[in-house]
């Protein structure tokens, strides 16, 4: 009895409601959707944290509130900046010449990069074939993006975006989000690689 009490759940894990479209999915499709959802949820949490520490950014875009700014940059389809790649959009957040919302550039660039690793699909069916290398590369890009936000400074010596500087608790919360995204992409890359080797 004591063991059960010690392992008591602190919350519920809820899956998605059944949809008829799920009949056309195999296990890998469902796993891919789950991993992608984990990453996008983490990016949304990251956007909230960054806007809280950098409120001047959502105000640049004329948003009425932090909540509306987050809703805008996590919309589907993504509010991409025209004619630049997702990687270039991430880098735009660290360009001193850029006068726009740096959090938006950073988060939307990451969202677009992750989505590209899933061949720009949000739902997967039996005929979809993901590439392990794209997923693996995206995990490495997330690592680089994490480094940029912590280490990239303006010419005046200030960080472009305040993130994990401050208390150890704040540092840990940011690191957990990046770690969650990297782990999800690496895990999905390994699953796809293992499946490809079995075929």
Task: Describe the residue ranges of each PLM region.
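C-terminal motif of bacterial Sec signal peptides marking the signal peptidase cleavage site
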Residues: 3-6
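N-terminal Sec/ER secretory leader and immediately downstream segment
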Residues: 8-103
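Mature extracellular/secreted ectodomains of secretory-pathway proteins
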Residues: 59-196
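Short, cationic, amphipathic peptide segments
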Residues: 9-15, 22-30, 51-54, 168-199
């Amino acid at each position: 009895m004591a063991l059960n009490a010690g392992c008591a759940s602190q919350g519920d894990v809820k899956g998605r409601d059944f949809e008829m479209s799920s009949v056309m999915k195999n296990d890998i499709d469902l796993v891919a959707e789950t991993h992608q959802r984990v990453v996008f949820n983490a990016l949304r949490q990251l956007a909230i944290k960054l806007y809280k520490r950098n409120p001047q950014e959502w105000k640049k875009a004329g948003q009425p509130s932090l909540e509306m700014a987050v809703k805008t940059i996590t919309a589907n389809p993504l509010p991409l900046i025209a004619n630049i790649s997702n990687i270039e959009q991430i880098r735009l957040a660290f360009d001193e010449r850029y006068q726009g919302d740096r959090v938006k550039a950073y988060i939307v660039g990451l969202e677009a990069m992750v989505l590209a690793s899933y061949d720009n699909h949000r739902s997967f069916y039996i005929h979809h074939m993901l590439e392990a290398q794209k997923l693996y590369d995206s995990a490495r890009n997330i690592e680089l993006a994490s480094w940029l936000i912590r280490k990239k400074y303006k010419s005046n010596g200030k960080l472009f975006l305040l993130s994990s500087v401050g208390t150890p608790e704040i540092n840990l919360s940011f690191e957990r989000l990046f770690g969650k995204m990297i782990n999800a992409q690496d895990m999905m890359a390994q699953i796809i690689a293992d499946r490809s080797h079995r075929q």
